[in-house]
């Protein structure tokens, strides 16, 4: 199944689409995040929630593989590999969304500050998003990954969407504006 990417500089015109993910299995959802160290990370819903990294986000990924070439997409792992729970497979999760936590929201787990977040929609069970934390998105060490069971989304189920970190002051301004 192919995923194509057009590019735009003005959001009025787009380039012709080019293959971006060209694999035999289905890819239905993909999210990307650029880290301060210049690496791009991507989480995709294929047969698992698959995590990859590259320095060239335009590289075409033809198969899931580990490579030392920084200009190709290199396989980091799947949520099942990293967290060891079969309920993280294609049958349970989709809609991954990567993000960076605000400094005040970074939790320490296993003695490691977990700066990054990954949310996935538990579509098969109709439960909405389930959150995860990572100290290092490029790490295959299970100690750098954890389920974020302490995050409370309230009663309203959260489904496919985007994460926009805001400060406490921004949150309060939104609350004040829309309180009534």
Locations of the language-model features?
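Carbohydrate-active catalytic/glycan-binding domains of CAZyme proteins
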Residues: 1-180
């Amino acid at each position: 199944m192919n995923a194509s990417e057009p590019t735009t500089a003005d959001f009025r015109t787009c380039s012709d689409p080019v293959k971006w993910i060209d694999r035999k299995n289905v890819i239905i959802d993909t999210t990307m995040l650029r880290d301060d160290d210049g690496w791009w990370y991507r989480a995709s819903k294929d047969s698992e929630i698959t995590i990859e990294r590259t320095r060239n986000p335009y590289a075409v990924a033809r198969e899931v593989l580990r490579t030392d070439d920084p200009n190709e997409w290199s396989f980091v792992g799947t949520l099942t590999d990293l967290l060891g729970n079969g309920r993280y497979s294609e049958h349970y999760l989709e809609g991954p969304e990567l993000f960076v936590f605000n400094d005040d929201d970074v939790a320490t787990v296993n003695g490691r500050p977990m700066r990054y977040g990954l949310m996935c929609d538990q579509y098969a069970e109709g439960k909405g998003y389930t959150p995860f934390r990572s100290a290092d998105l490029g790490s295959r060490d299970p100690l750098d990954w954890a389920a974020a069971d302490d995050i409370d989304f309230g009663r309203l189920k959260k489904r496919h969407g985007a994460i926009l970190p805001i400060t406490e002051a921004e949150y309060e301004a939104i609350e004040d504006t829309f309180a009534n």
